[in-house]
Structures are given as structure tokens and as C-alpha cells.
């Protein structure tokens, strides 16, 4: 396995640890989730290109579309929560209440 794959897997792992460590702030969690999605995009693109698997060439593009939608929804929730409560602490919120 080339070292580029190990570096990307390590970047994904560090971003996942970041989600677990910085889960009290919504903005930090969103940034770590974006790092995870970016490393998945790069890893899937490299795997598809190295294996010459032409049937799955659309998968990284679809992954980026879902990442963009996730970022838009996350930022909209961040704006709504910060306007309503004045903070972005996830632990102080109960989003199940109306």
C-alpha cells in the first residue's frame, strides 16, 4: 500500500478524533466532518484511478454533492441555533423540543 493511502486514512482518522474531541461546539464538529468528507473524496478518487474502475467514476462527484449539501444544512443549523440561543454549544441544546 503506497504511503499516500496511509496519509489519507490518517487524515480521516484525525478528523474523526476531532469530531469526538470537539463535539461541544457545532462549528468545530462541522469542520471536522468536512475534513472527513474531503479525505473520503480523495481516497475514493485515488482508488478508482489506480484500479482503472471506469464504472465508478461518478462516485466521487456524488460524494462531493452530498458533502456540499451536508455543509449547507450544517451551516443553516448553526446560524439558526446561534441566532436563537446566542451560542453554538451542542451540549446545552435539546433540538427535539419545539
UniProtKB/Swiss-Prot annotation:
Q: Which InterPro entries match?
A: NADH_UbQ_OxRdtase_chain4L/K, NUOK/Mnh_C1-like
Looking at the keywords, is Iron-sulfur present?
no
Transmembrane residue ranges: 1-21, 29-49, 61-81
Q: Does the keyword Translocase apply?
A: yes
**Where in or outside the cell?**
Mitochondrion inner membrane
Which GO-annotated molecular functions does the record name?
A: NADH dehydrogenase (ubiquinone) activity
Q: What is its EC number?
A: 7.1.1.2
Catalyzed reactions per annotation: a ubiquinone + NADH + 5 H(+)(in) = a ubiquinol + NAD(+) + 4 H(+)(out)
Gene3D superfamilies named in the record? 1.10.287.3510
According to its record, how does it sit in the membrane?
Multi-pass membrane protein
Listed under GO cellular component are: mitochondrial inner membrane; respiratory chain complex I
Record Pfam families: Oxidored_q2
Any GO BP = ATP synthesis coupled electron transport
Question: Which cysteine pairs are covalently linked by disulfides here?
Answer: none
Keywords for this protein:
Electron transport, Membrane, Mitochondrion, Mitochondrion inner membrane, NAD, Respiratory chain, Translocase, Transmembrane, Transmembrane helix, Transport, Ubiquinone
Query: Subunit comment for this entry?
Result: Core subunit of respiratory chain NADH dehydrogenase (Complex I) which is composed of 45 different subunits.
Could you say which protein family the record assigns here? Belongs to the complex I subunit 4L family.
Its job: Core subunit of the mitochondrial membrane respiratory chain NADH dehydrogenase (Complex I) which catalyzes electron transfer from NADH through the respiratory chain, using ubiquinone as an electron acceptor. Part of the enzyme membrane arm which is embedded in the lipid bilayer and involved in proton translocation.
Q: What is this protein called?
A: NADH-ubiquinone oxidoreductase chain 4L
UniProt source species: Dasypus novemcinctus (Nine-banded armadillo)
Amino acid at each position: 500500500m503506497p504511503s499516500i493511502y496511509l496519509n489519507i486514512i490518517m487524515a480521516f482518522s484525525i478528523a474523526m478524533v476531532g469530531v469526538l474531541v470537539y463535539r461541544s461546539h457545532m462549528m468545530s464538529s462541522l469542520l471536522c466532518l468536512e475534513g472527513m468528507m474531503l479525505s473520503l473524496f480523495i481516497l475514493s478518487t485515488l482508488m478508482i484511478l489506480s484500479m482503472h474502475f471506469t464504472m465508478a467514476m461518478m462516485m466521487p462527484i456524488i460524494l462531493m454533492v452530498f458533502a456540499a449539501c451536508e455543509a449547507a444544512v450544517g451551516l443553516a443549523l448553526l446560524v439558526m441555533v446561534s441566532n436563537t440561543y446566542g451560542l453554538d454549544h451542542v451540549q446545552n441544546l435539546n433540538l427535539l423540543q419545539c
